[in-house]
Swiss-Prot record:
GO terms for biological process: positive regulation of potassium ion transmembrane transport; potassium ion transport. Its EC number is 1.6.5.2. The keyword Thylakoid does not apply. This is Glutathione-regulated potassium-efflux system ancillary protein KefG. The gene is kefG.
Length: 182
């Protein structure tokens, strides 16, 4: 039987203790041997990122999952700092920057709004695909394959059984991330 590719799950939530949805998503994932869950806020509460360590983690994994809440139409501050520092020129992009070539990027995002608010003319003015375009472009800049994101809309208001269903789908995808869509 083929082994699944190694997955690095970069989790970034500054108030993780208050996020029921993210806890429900993460709990079953931690049982998967081929998945490394790396909580950025737990590792770097002072925002001093060990760039070489993070780059080695990226080298050691084939699939990179960025799990975070949508904050101000982007990601939490520490993840933005991580992206800017770790995906450095010469490592992930630019001259000689091919360390991530051929790897896969997937964003797993929780939002505080309903799906219908993310559309042209809606409360948030733009569809989620447009809001996430900077992440897709970053993946492309790093020569990575973009996998369609998993988005849990209105996360804090989801029923427990709905969150459990999302968590089950997440685990199923992680068990075979390069052959399953979501």
């Amino acid at each position: 039987m083929l082994q699944p590719p190694k997955v690095l799950l970069l989790y970034a939530h500054p108030e993780s203790q208050d996020s029921v949805a993210n806890r429900v998503l993460l709990q079953p994932v931690q049982q998967l041997e081929h998945v490394t869950v790396h909580d950025l806020y737990a590792h770097y509460p002072d925002f001093f990122i060990d760039i070489h360590h993070e780059q080695q983690l990226l080298r050691d994994h084939q699939v990179i999952v960025f799990q975070h809440p949508l904050y101000t139409y982007s990601c939490p501050a520490l993840l933005k700092e991580w992206l800017d520092r770790v995906l450095a020129r010469g490592f992930a992009n630019g001259v000689g920057g091919h360390a991530l070539t051929g790897k896969h990027w997937r964003s797993v995002i929780t939002t505080g709004e309903q799906e219908g608010t993310y559309r042209i003319g809606g409360y948030n003015r733009y569809p989620m695909e447009d809001i996430l375009r900077p992440f897709e472009l970053t993946a492309a800049m790093c020569h990575m394959h973009w996998i369609n994101p998993m988005i849990i809309y209105w996360a804090r208001r989801q029923k427990p059984e709905t969150l459990a269903s999302h968590a089950q789908a997440y685990v199923q995808w992680l068990q075979s991330p390069l052959t399953r869509g979501l």
